[in-house]
Design a protein with these regions (language model features):
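Auxiliary, metal-adjacent structural segments of Zn-dependent hydrolase domains
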Residues: 43-134, 138-142
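Active-site recognition of the HExxH zinc-binding catalytic motif
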Residues: 53, 147-164, 191-192, 244, ...
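Acidic helix-start/capping segments at beta-turn-to-alpha-helix junctions
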Residues: 62-83, 171-175, 209-220, 263-264
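Post-HExxH zinc-binding segment in Zn-dependent metallohydrolases
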Residues: 159-211
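Pan-zinc metallopeptidase signature
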Residues: 220-343, 349
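C-terminal soluble interaction/assembly domains
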Residues: 331, 339-408
Length: 408
C-alpha cells in the first residue's frame, strides 16, 4: 500500500463534507505525537497514511491522531485487558446462552471471547483516549498492517468529526443494545468501506501480498466458535459495509456523515443495517411491558433483542433459511434477562410487522424451543394480545412465575 495508489477509488476531499470538515484547523502540523522514537521513514509513512485517509474519506483531522505502535504480543495483551474490563457481565450472559442452547456447557464465555478477540483483532481505536493501537513488525508496515492503519485512522477521523464513541457509549450504558449494534454497524461499515477504497487502489503485486498475508492469520478460535459468536463478531463489518455503501450510493459521503447524527434519533436498529432500504423508513415498534420481580434473582438487563438477535439464534439452531424468513418480519421487541448467580431466566416479547410475521416467528420459536432448550428447563411460547411471548428458565418454578405474571 504505497502513497502513489492512494487516490484510486477514492473521492474528492470536498465530497459530502461541509466547510468545517474540509478546512484543516491547523494546516501546519507535519508530525504525529508519540512516534518520535520510530525511524524517520516509518514516521513519514504514518503521516502519509493519515493524509491518504483524509483524502479517501473526504474529511480532515481536527487534531493530529495519537498512534501507539506495539508488538503483536503487546496488542494481544491490551485487547485481553479491554475484554476483562467487561467481565462483570459475562457470568449472566454465559448462563443465558447455555439456557438458550447456544453455548455448550463446557465452554466458558469469558475465556472464549478473550481468546477470540486476542486472535482476531489486528488493531483498535480507543475512544476514551483517542489512541490508535496497531502492530508493526521490524522493517516497517506490511500491506495488511497499512490496511489496518487506514481502518483505524478512519475511526479516529470520524470520532473527531462526529463524536461517535460517546454516542455509542451512552447507548451501551442505557442498555439500548440493538440500537448500539446498529450504530456500531455504521461506524465499522464506514471504516471498512474506506479501507476497501484504499485496497482498490493497490497494484496487483500489492494485492497479492495482502491476500497472502491475510490468509496466514490464525483463525483457530474463530473457526471453532459457535455460529452465533462468529456471526456477531462479523456483523458490524459485513452488514455494516453494505449499509455504508448503500448510504454512499444514495448521497455520497454526506449521507454517511449525516447518519452519525440521524441514527441515534430514529432510533436506529439492526433491521435497518441488515436491510438498508429500511433506514429512516421502517422504524422499530416500541414494545412495552411491566417489570416482573423474581425472588432471589436480579434483573440483569432489559433491552431490545432486535432482528439480528433473532437471526443469530435461529440461524445456529434451525438454519439460515428459517432464520431469514422468521426474523425478516421483525417489528419490535423487548426482553428481560434475570440471573441469580447460577441460573438464568428470560422473557422475550415480540411484535411482527404483520400477523403473518407473528405466526412465522411463533412457528420458528416453537421449533427452536423443542430443539435447543434442555428437557429439564422451562420453556413456553404463546401469542396473546398481538404479542409473542418466549419464556425460558433454568428453574421450572421461576418459569412458571413469569408465565403466570404474563397471563395476569
Amino acid at each position: 500500500m504505497d502513497e502513489s495508489s492512494s487516490t484510486t477509488g477514492g473521492t474528492d476531499t470536498e465530497s459530502g463534507a461541509d466547510d468545517t470538515t474540509t478546512t484543516r484547523p491547523d494546516p501546519t502540523w507535519t508530525e504525529l505525537p508519540g512516534i518520535e522514537d520510530l525511524p524517520q521513514e516509518v514516521q513519514d509513512e504514518l503521516l502519509a497514511l493519515v493524509r491518504i485517509t483524509e483524502e479517501l474519506r473526504g474529511l480532515v483531522f481536527i487534531e493530529a491522531p495519537i498512534i501507539s505502535i506495539v508488538t503483536d504480543a503487546e496488542l494481544e495483551a491490551r485487547v485481553r485487558a479491554l475484554i476483562e474490563e467487561e467481565s462483570a457481565d459475562f457470568p449472566a450472559d454465559d448462563a443465558l446462552y447455555k439456557l438458550l442452547g447456544l453455548l455448550d456447557e463446557e465452554v466458558v464465555l469469558e475465556t472464549l471471547l478473550t481468546d477470540l478477540y486476542g486472535e482476531q483483532v489486528a488493531g483498535f481505536y480507543d475512544g476514551e483516549t483517542g489512541e490508535l493501537v496497531v502492530p508493526m513488525r521490524s522493517g516497517g508496515f506490511s500491506v495488511v498492517e497499512k490496511s489496518t492503519m487506514i481502518h483505524e485512522l478512519t475511526h479516529s477521523l470520524t470520532d473527531q468529526q462526529f463524536d461517535f464513541d460517546s454516542v455509542m457509549e451512552s447507548m451501551f450504558d442505557e442498555e439500548r443494545l440493538d440500537q448500539a449494534s446498529a450504530y456500531q454497524g455504521l461506524v465499522e461499515g464506514d471504516a471498512t468501506f474506506t479501507e476497501l477504497l484504499y485496497l482498490q487502489g493497490l497494484s496487483q503485486r500489492e494485492l497479492g501480498e495482502f491476500f497472502a498475508e491475510a490468509s496466514d492469520v490464525d483463525s483457530t478460535t474463530l473457526n471453532s466458535s459457535p455460529q452465533f459468536i462468529r456471526d456477531s463478531l462479523i456483523f458490524p463489518y459485513d452488514a455494516g459495509l453494505e449499509f455504508a455503501q448503500s448510504l454512499y450510493r444514495a448521497g455520497d459521503w454526506k449521507a454517511v456523515n449525516d447518519a452519525y447524527s440521524i441514527m441515534p434519533g430514529l432510533p436506529g436498529s439492526t433491521e435497518q443495517v441488515i436491510t438498508p432500504s429500511d433506514y429512516q423508513r421502517d422504524l422499530p415498534i416500541e414494545v412495552l411491558a411491566e417489570t416482573i420481580t423474581l425472588s432471589g434473582y436480579d434483573l440483569e438487563r432489559q433491552s431490545v433483542w432486535g432482528e439480528f438477535g433473532f437471526r443469530v439464534m435461529l440461524d445456529q439452531v434451525l438454519g439460515e433459511a428459517t432464520g431469514l424468513v422468521a426474523a425478516d418480519g421483525w417489528g419490535g421487541d423487548t426482553y428481560f434477562q434475570w440471573f441469580d448467580g447460577d441460573n438464568a431466566a428470560f422473557l422475550l416479547l415480540y411484535e411482527g410487522d404483520t400477523e403473518r410475521d407473528l405466526e412465522e416467528m411463533k412457528d420458528a420459536l416453537v421449533d427452536y424451543a423443542r430443539t435447543a432448550v434442555a428437557d429439564e428447563d422451562f420453556v413456553w411460547v404463546e401469542v396473546f394480545d398481538n404479542q409473542l411471548a418466549f419464556i425460558a428458565a433454568d428453574e421450572v418454578p421461576v418459569g412458571e412465575t413469569i408465565r403466570s405474571a404474563m397471563q395476569g
